[in-house]
Structures are given as structure tokens and as C-alpha cells.
């Protein structure tokens, strides 16, 4: 069953695929479980398929939308339901901390992310995890599989390690192409990310950690001795208890953290 609010053609330049299937809309709302007074921020509200049910539950909501043509009809549809604040900007330029007012609840992020820039958006919000309670995103299933992949998996990579270091990542359910208008060529999936307690992460230098993960998976067929030759010495590996002939996909997230924290003495 389709649920379309207004006739706004999808724009390929924005990577738009509007969710229109009521069954999957309801499943997503149930997964989010919105509560009154939740501080929800939606990335890419589109035609409001998720926006309006959330607004009805919470009374207010902030949406970040780049497509100017969607703002007026979305505002009109939202007016009877509650207070909708729309930020007309690229989400990659938005500092979410300006939305997290002192004393307020942490932000809850939701969104059907444009597939062409989903990874940059994930890394952008990851940098602001301290002010986020949880995130529910719809992405290309292939990306969701990479996000939740365990060590040893063929799709375990930089995205897996970086997200799992800071968040608990859960794959919720798959959404087929025919739930969208226009339908994408691939399956989508809903993922839930819950930022970890910062006191349990214990990464001494986040830049060094990021550099090590990037370099290790940038040459994933090489042993870590070779792929990290410019970053880690034998002493780093010894102190972290990691074999130099191991490859990136064999390391647990905690082992990458140990290697980043290891001393060169």
C-alpha cells in the first residue's frame, strides 16, 4: 500500500528515492519507538513519510533538507501535527551541537540517507556521537552489511571498525526496492546505531586510531607489517600483542584500539 503526500519528482542529483510503502513506514516508526518530547533530527525528510508520523508522536522535530522544492509542501503537511523546523542545508555542513541545547535530551537521529553520500554522512555524525542518543538510518543493504560485519568477513573494513568502535550497530530489517518511488536498483536496510559510553571507548588519540584503520584497510591484502610500516614500529605491535604478519580483516575492533594506544618504547 502506497502513501504519498505530495507530487514532488525525485531528483537524481540528490540521490532521492522516496519511501511510499505504508507497511515499511509503520515498521520503521515501530523500530524508532518515538516518545513525547524526544529531540529528533531527521536527515532528508523527503515527502514526509517518516517525518509526519514522528511529528505526531513527538510534537516537534528538526529536519535537514537540501532540496528547496520539498520545503514548502512538507511545511504545509506538518503544520496541523506539530512544530517542524527545517534546516535548508547540506547535512555535511551542519554542526549538530547547535541543536543540542544545554540541559536537553540527547539527539535522536533518523533518516533515509542518500546512497551516494551515505558513508560521508555516517563519518560526519560519528564525530558528534557524544550528543547523540541513537540513530536509525535506512541505507543501501550492502552498506549496512559492511557496518555490522564481524572480523574475518569479506565486507569487514574501515567503515565496520570505525562505527563499531564508537557505536553498537544492529541491523534491523531489509526494505525491498518496490517500497520506494522511484525504486532503487538494490535492497535497502534499516540499521540502529547506539553510541557507546565515552568512558568505555578508551582511544587515546582518535586521529592516530583513524589513520591506522585507514592505512590497514587501504592495503588490506598486505600484512600489517607492510601496510602500517609508516605508522607503527615493531614495538607498537609487541606492546599491543598483535602479530605483524596479520592482515587488517583479522583484527578485532579492540585490537585496532590497542595498536593505536601502544607505546613505541
From Swiss-Prot:
**GO-annotated molecular function:** 16S rRNA (adenine(1518)-N(6)/adenine(1519)-N(6))-dimethyltransferase activity; RNA binding
Name this protein carries in UniProt: Ribosomal RNA small subunit methyltransferase A
Which positions bind S-adenosyl-L-methionine? 17, 19, 44, 65, 90, 112
Q: Which reaction does it catalyse?
A: adenosine(1518)/adenosine(1519) in 16S rRNA + 4 S-adenosyl-L-methionine = N(6)-dimethyladenosine(1518)/N(6)-dimethyladenosine(1519) in 16S rRNA + 4 S-adenosyl-L-homocysteine + 4 H(+)
Q: Which InterPro entries match?
A: KsgA/Erm (IPR001737), rRNA_Ade_diMease-like_C (IPR023165), rRNA_Ade_Mease_Trfase_CS (IPR020596), rRNA_Ade_methylase_Trfase_N (IPR020598), rRNA_adenine_dimethylase (IPR011530), SAM-dependent_MTases_sf (IPR029063)
Q: Where in the cell is it found?
A: Cytoplasm
The catalytic activity of this protein is classed by the Enzyme Commission as: 2.1.1.182
Gene for this chain: rsmA
Record's function text:
Specifically dimethylates two adjacent adenosines (A1518 and A1519) in the loop of a conserved hairpin near the 3'-end of 16S rRNA in the 30S particle. May play a critical role in biogenesis of 30S subunits.
Q: List the disulfide bonds.
A: none
HAMAP family noted in UniProt = 16SrRNA_methyltr_A
What GO terms fall under cellular component here? cytosol
Sorted alphabetically, the keyword list is: Cytoplasm, Methyltransferase, RNA-binding, rRNA processing, S-adenosyl-L-methionine, Transferase
Superkingdom = Bacteria
Family, per entry: Belongs to the class I-like SAM-binding methyltransferase superfamily. rRNA adenine N(6)-methyltransferase family. RsmA subfamily.
Any Pfam family from its record, for instance, is: RrnaAD
Amino acid at each position: 500500500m502506497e502513501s504519498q503526500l505530495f507530487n514532488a519528482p525525485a531528483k537524481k542529483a540528490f540521490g532521492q528515492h522516496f519511501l511510499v510503502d505504508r507497511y515499511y513506514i509503520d515498521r520503521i516508526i515501530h523500530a524508532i519507538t518515538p516518545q513525547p518530547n524526544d529531540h529528533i533530527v531527521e536527515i532528508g525528510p523527503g515527502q514526509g513519510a517518516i517525518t509526519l508520523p514522528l511529528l505526531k508522536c513527538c510534537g516537534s522535530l528538526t529536519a535537514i533538507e537540501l532540496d528547496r522544492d520539498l520545503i514548502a509542501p512538507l511545511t504545509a503537511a506538518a503544520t496541523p501535527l506539530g512544530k517542524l523546523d527545517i534546516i535548508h542545508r547540506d547535512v555535511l555542513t551542519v554542526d549538530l551541537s547547535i541543536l543540542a541545547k544545554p540541559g536537553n535530551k540527547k539527539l535522536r537521529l533518523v533518516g533515509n540517507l542518500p546512497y551516494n553520500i551515505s558513508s560521508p554522512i555516517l563519518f560526519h555524525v560519528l564525530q558528534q556521537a557524544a550528543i547523540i542518543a541513537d540513530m536509525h538510518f535506512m541505507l543501501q543493504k550492502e552498506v549496512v552489511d559492511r557496518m555490522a560485519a564481524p572480523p574475518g568477513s569479506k565486507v569487514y573494513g574501515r567503515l565496520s571498525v570505525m562505527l563499531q568502535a564508537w557505536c553498537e550497530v544492529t541491523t534491523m530489517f531489509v526494505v525491498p526496492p518496490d517500497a520506494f518511488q522511484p525504486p532503487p536498483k538494490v535492497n535497502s536496510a534499516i540499521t540502529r546505531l547506539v553510541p557507546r559510553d565515552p568512558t568505555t571507548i578508551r582511544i587515546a588519540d582518535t586521529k592516530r586510531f583513524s589513520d591506522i584503520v585507514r592505512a590497514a584497510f587501504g592495503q588490506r591484502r598486505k600484512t600489517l607489517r607492510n601496510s602500517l610500516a609508516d605508522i607503527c614500529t615493531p614495538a607498537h605491535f609487541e606492546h599491543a600483542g598483535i602479530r605483524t604478519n596479520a592482515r587488517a580483516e583479522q583484527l578485532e575492533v579492540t585490537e585496532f584500539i590497542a595498536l593505536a594506544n601502544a607505546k613505541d618504547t
